[in-house]
Amino acid sequence: MGDSDDEYDRRRRDKFRRERSDYDRSRERDERRRGDDWNDREWDHGRERRSRGEYRDYDRNRRERFSPPRHELSPPQKRMRRDWDGHSSDPYHSGYEMPYAGGGGGPTYGPPQPWGHPGVHIMQHHVLPIQARLGSIAEIDLGVPPPVMKTFKEFLLSLDDSVDETEAVKRYNDYKLDFRRQQMQDFFLAHKDEEWFRSKYHPDEVGKRRQEARGALQNRLRVFLSLMETGWFDNLLLDIDKADAIVKMLDAAVIKMEGGTENDLRILEQEEEEEQAGKPGEPGKKEEGRAGAGLGDGERKTNDKDEKKEDSKQAENDSSNDDKTKKSEGDGDKEEKKEDSEKEAKKSSKKRNRKHSGDDSFDEGSMSESESESESGQAEEEKEEAEALKEKEKPKEEEWEKPKDAAGLECKPRPLHKTCSLFMRNIAPNISRAEIISLCKRYPGFMRVALSEPQPERRFFRRGWVTFDRSVNIKEICWNLQNIRLRECELSPGVNRDLTRRVRNINGITQHKQIVRNDIKLAAKLIHTLDDRTQLWASEPGTPPLPTSLPSQNPILKNITDYLIEEVSAEEEELLGSSGGAPPEEPPKEGNPAEINVERDEKLIKVLDKLLLYLRIVHSLDYYNTCEYPNEDEMPNRCGIIHVRGPMPPNRISHGEVLEWQKTFEEKLTPLLSVRESLSEEEAQKMGRKDPEQEVEKFVTSNTQELGKDKWLCPLSGKKFKGPEFVRKHIFNKHAEKIEEVKKEVAFFNNFLTDAKRPALPEIKPAQPPGPAQSLTPGLPYPHQTPQGLMPYGQPRPPILGYGAGAVRPAVPTGGPPYPHAPYGAGRGNYDAFRGQGGYPGKPRNRMVRGDPRAIVEYRDLDAPDDVDFF
């Protein structure tokens, strides 16, 4: 074993061997005994001595040990297989090498250290977003942790003993109210300057946002009515077997939303024909169709220029195709053709170079700066060459396009329903939408930016999607944006994939007649609620919403009541049921009489589907998924996913299943049907609602300063007056804009306060010591399987399986939970911990884990009282 630990330790200590012994004989005997091992001691004189770390390549995380060997008093240690070898990813065998540990060394098999000792980060690692841990967020400013509300028990400790229980409860309720009020005001001050917050609550921004949302909604309504008039919904059913037709309809809606014409809708027919024609080579042919189907000649050339990262075969095919088109255009000069072919050859060779150097490194994310510089140089050269080629070919293009215009042929349809997009995972709350737009506008084909709602658990960071036209080279744009920072925040964009399954199905029980009728009722109610909330059918934006008693102007709801009322033959049933017998029309059912067949009513389904399509296209609400897609007009796919009915259930269904489905579905729809919640006047006053007049008075008073007798100053302008009434008059006359700002600030705060669903910091509950029965985390059967991130602050980590009982056990810290029971089957010394509920932790046994044969023997006086501090 040339590189074992024992051999290496002996080599390190060899230079001290002669100094340790005064007996020459013993020294000679030692050297004679070990002479075979050390006869090549000149081994390291001729070359540079290897560092100690190189001997540990097989286990880099081991701690360096320089302790003397223990061969004086005990027999030589056997070279045993170490239990942590080959188990680096196993939490049971990896020692305590977690990111939380302060030491950073190897495995420690002493007493488990509590996590709260000095040197450990105060904020736990798992609280931060993953990008912060990986370094995508530039600086993590944790700031002061928010205060935690006291429990009633903690609050009682701060009260005098003379306070009775009723008074204590009253004071605690007042404390809670004050705490929440203060927390809300702090939150308002912390976020009032951020764009997302102002757009939600500031009076000026709220008005603009509502106007934009209303304009987008009316555009979607026009698209829906246009598609309905042209018969797109006539034979369309929302069933999973009609997925292709549904996708086609959604694409048509998107083309219309993007301002497309009936001519642009022809692209959908062309794509369908291409799919049917080229099924074997579907992927390649789809790409070709997408690139060239609806683009003009100029756009096709930019497309060819952008698709540099295709494989070399395709590059050669493209160049040969270009040559063919040039031949068909007319006989040019031979010299020009030679130059063009030479340039094409150069381009193709550069394409190959870029493919090997650029594409691979982009995918692996490991391109060096020098490579990126050379690539940018190549890109500039290629752009210059492409521009020169364009200038040469312009006259030819004009000649080619003139006969087309003369013939009066229609323009090619545009694929407006297809886009390219980038996804940005972390956008800081202080970055505005306008900044991202101005950054991305520099690149050709930019369309729009969408930002998600901020996430309180991720420090109010947002996700973003930047949409570009389909003709651009999205990977090149993504690469150019990689290292750009906005306000010290790396955007780190990635290419957003196209949606794979745009039509998804739910349970086929939804085809049943009873459920369909119930869905019609719910969908009609939902349409009515959303139309009233957005005032979509109101004549003017300022008009009040229609009362629910009046019929809606929405044509989709016309005569809807005809389908909501179920016709029953009650009189006939009463007459026939008086004898207690069942109606003769219903034959006795085989099997379970409570089961029924799924009954499908095509007429009802057609009515329901029109309502669901209205909800999906106009209000961006996916009925069967019971969710609303927010800001869908700004997303890359303006009509992306829809959920439809699944295939008919093969078996019969019970009446209970139908009722259960209806009940569950109505519960899921309740949040969408509820009116936007706002606090009542009384609750708002309790939470600190501000009065505009009082705030204006406070503003005037604070800006009226007395300098001396009959001498008053207005600090806003620096002018002096003889009395406070003159200062007041001056402020109202000369600083009216400041007064308006105060009123707007009050409205800003009140809008935030009255929103019942206002954003707030995630509530941090104080760590409560769980009882003995709660020592195991739910879902994790054994204490050794408890993840360290879920354990309370300051609690000692559980012992490693196989070493827990043998290690010296520390005292449980104050406030921490009792030591967890040993796992099931701990065996001797524990007397079945799960049955007795009071046994001390025994040695966990596991056949796959090697225990320590030299574990400390545990002795326990069975008559002694329970104590946690024993071996």
From Swiss-Prot:
Keyword Transmembrane helix tagged: no
Encoding gene, per UniProt annotation: SRRT
Subunit description: Interacts with CASP8AP2, ERBB4, NCBP1/CBP80 and DROSHA. Interacts with LUZP4. Interacts with NCBP2/CBP20 and NCBP3. Interacts with MTREX.
Entries under Pfam families matching the protein: ARS2 (PF04959), SERRATE_Ars2_N (PF12066)
Ranges of biased composition (kind: Basic and acidic residues): 8-73, 297-347, 386-411
Positions of modified residues (Phosphothreonine): 543, 670
Record carries keyword Transcription regulation: yes
Residues modified to Phosphotyrosine: 8
Protein name: Serrate RNA effector molecule homolog
Family per record: Belongs to the ARS2 family.
Location(s) in or outside the cell: Nucleus, Nucleoplasm; Cytoplasm
Species of provenance: Pongo abelii (Sumatran orangutan)
Superkingdom classification of source: Eukaryota
In-chain residues carrying the UniProt-annotated modification Phosphoserine: 4, 67, 74, 136, 492, 539, 569, 678
Modified residues (N-acetylglycine): 2
Main location per the UniProt record: nucleus
